[in-house]
Design a protein with these regions (language model features):
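Short acidic-hydrophobic, aromatic-tinged amphipathic segments that line or gate anion-handling sites
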Residues: 547-562
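Transmembrane helical cores of multi-pass ion-transport proteins
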Residues: 25-443, 447, 542
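The feature marks cytosolic C-terminal regulatory regions of anion transporters and related permeases
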Residues: 383-541, 545-546, 564
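Active-site-adjacent beta-strand anchor residues
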Residues: 99, 527-528, 553
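Short, positively charged and aromatic/hydrophobic N-terminal segments
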Residues: 6-22
Length: 566
């Protein structure tokens, strides 16, 4: 109850900051919870209850592991999942989003804590929360599409590497002579400390990894990470193995989260401002990406602006109640959907169950071996790395996109996300401007002959055919313009691309999603008049072969003839 009494004034301040005219047009900031409750029923509540409990069980070991990877205490991970998880579900723009600490923040949070302490982290997170609220109020939810696919793929893979490097010490039971902050320094210290490897710790870590790999193949309901925690804790405790546990390194608290105002100074604000911006951008990208994945799974559409406001409120409250940055978690959101969650109530139940865990079971967290925590984070890093996508982009993309991907990846590993995202975006923009400059020189482009393409202003289109014409270059900022399928009685979709001079990997990824959507709806996709550069990208990526050469036609008349055959 104290938590709600503290947070309500914050919501009131947000309301006062919005002009009267803006409040009259606030439907774009309507939480999905209100819509869900309009036709809520006992059956839906039971589904949300079951799903919320299961997701809480999944979130428990992850929240503890991610807290430790972030350089904070185990209970702070639960504080984050409870406070931010509840508020983001209650106020969010998605029906099924589950929020909490995620691996994406681990390295940046650990760096802030090492340099500026917990007060610095709290200030950075509050500032990030305010930025997210402003982004939502100013309807900037759609702006996230301007982050290229290559950058998100690059920094996600880079974050995965930093997590693995950061957990090598605990997995191998090593003793470091100093406490390095940067990833490169951690790797150097690991190599210098190889003589301190604890083989018993390695065995426990390998057992935890094996459980997480093998268990899901036979049992889906009980999370493998929880099984790994229970088995390794019992083994280390029962056999008195010489392996560090959480209790050996941290003092476990069962206190509920309480309001704590951080010490704020100009120096602190100036020091953490770049980190705050990075947290805000990362939270926006991760949460909206999770929403998109959820939309595809449940066939709904989220409210991106309301989601950003909820992320802002959740992160602000998390910081003030002792937590760390939070965002939508794709794995937990997918688990919520698969286990029957149908409304934001499931996320709120998940937070409530974690409160009970914090009060009743948290002392047992002291028994969890550190190699098991490292093994859990290894699996998190593997699952988030998207290494197959990473390699596919390198093999199939234009050289400019590959350059952006590799620059972002290496800068994330060697420096941090602040540098990686900034340099990656700058490079992507410069390469895009070069590409557009090349397009402007008409004689340098070889266009497919469009013979008999304009025999008449209007062409008869069969009733079972949809025709879309795309104009202008298709790059990362225009990928969202790719149409979605509204089938009805339609069996063929023609994309007329005579006015598309250039295509990048982000837009190609959008076309691939459209192709998959067409296949799900049994709609044939046909391309008309694809120019040289887009055709080269499609062939190099294998997309041309997937769609079939017979479905690429030189002009609209030939495309309509193909449609008549289907």
């Amino acid at each position: 109850m104290k938590f709600f009494l503290h947070i309500l004034p914050t919501l009131g301040i947000i309301n006062l900051c919005v002009s009267k005219e803006r409040r009259e047009d606030m439907n774009y900031l309507k939480p999905q919870l209100l819509e869900s409750l309009a036709d809520y029923s006992k059956e839906k509540f039971l589904k949300d209850l079951v799903s919320g409990v299961i997701v809480a069980i999944i979130a428990l070991p992850l929240s503890i592991a991610l807290a430790l990877a972030s350089g904070v205490t185990p209970e702070q991970g639960l504080y984050t999942a409870i406070v931010a998880g509840f508020l983001i579900s209650a106020l969010g723009g998605s029906k099924v989003q589950i929020a909490g600490p995620t691996a994406a923040f681990a390295s940046i949070v650990a760096g802030i804590v090492a340099r500026n302490g917990m007060d610095g982290l709290a200030v950075a997170t509050v500032m990030a929360g305010i930025l997210l609220i402003l982004m939502g109020v100013l309807r900037m939810g759609s702006m996230i599409k301007f982050i290229p696919y290559t950058i998100t793929t690059g920094f996600t893979a880079g974050i995965a590497v930093t997590i693995v490097v950061g957990q090598l010490k605990d997995f191998f039971g090593m003793t470091y002579g100093r406490s390095p902050i940067e990833t490169v320094e951690k790797m150097e210290e690991f190599l210098h400390s190889l003589d301190t490897v604890n083989l018993t710790a390695v065995a426990v870590g390998c057992l935890a990894l094996a459980i997480q790999i093998i268990w899901p193949r036979f049992f889906q309901k009980i999370p493998a990470s929880l099984v790994a925690v229970v088995v390794t804790a019992a083994l280390v405790r029962g056999l008195h193995l010489p392996v560090n546990t959480i209790g050996d390194l941290y003092t476990i608290s069962t206190d509920l989260p309480h309001l704590t105002i951080p010490a704020v100074s100009y120096d602190t604000v100036a020091a953490v401002l770049p980190d705050a911006c990075t947290i805000a951008i990362l939270a926006a990208i991760e949460s909206l990406l999770s929403c998109v994945v959820a939309d595809e799974m449940i066939g709904a559409r989220h409210n991106s602006n309301m989601e950003l406001v909820a992320q802002g409120v959740g992160n602000t409250a998390s910081a003030l109640f002792g937590g760390i940055p939070a965002t939508g978690a794709i794995a937990r959101t997918a688990a919520n959907i698969k286990n029957g969650g149908v409304s934001p109530v499931a996320g709120m139940v998940h937070a409530g169950v974690l409160v009970l865990v914090l009060v009743l079971l948290m002392p047992y967290a002291a028994l969890i071996p550190m190699p098991c925590i490292a093994a859990i984070l290894f699996m998190v890093a593997y699952n988030m790395s998207g290494w197959r996508t990473f390699l596919r982009v390198i093999r199939q993309s234009p050289k400019s996109d590959t350059a952006v991907l590799l620059f972002t990846f290496f800068l994330t590993v060697v420096f941090d996300l602040v540098v990686a995202i900034g340099v990656g975006l700058t490079l992507a923009c410069l390469l895009f401007m070069k590409r557009m400059a090349d397009v402007a020189v008409v004689h340098e482009w070889e266009y497919v002959e469009d013979t008999q393409d304009d025999q008449g202003r209007f062409k008869p289109v069969p009733a079972h055919v949809m025709v879309y014409e795309i104009n202008g270059p298709m790059f990362f900022g225009a990928a969202e313009k790719i149409p979605h399928i509204h089938t009805g009685e339609k069996r063929v979709l023609i994309l007329r691309m005579r006015s598309v001079p250039a295509l990048d990997i982000t837009a190609l990824n959008g076309l691939r999603r459209l192709w998959e959507e067409c296949r799900r709806h049994q709609v044939q996709l046909v391309f008309s008049h694809v120019n040289q550069q887009p055709m080269s990208v499609m062939k190099k990526s294998g997309f041309y072969d997937e769609v079939g050469a017979e479905n690429f036609r030189p002009n609209i008349d030939a495309a309509l003839e193909r449609a008549q055959e289907l």
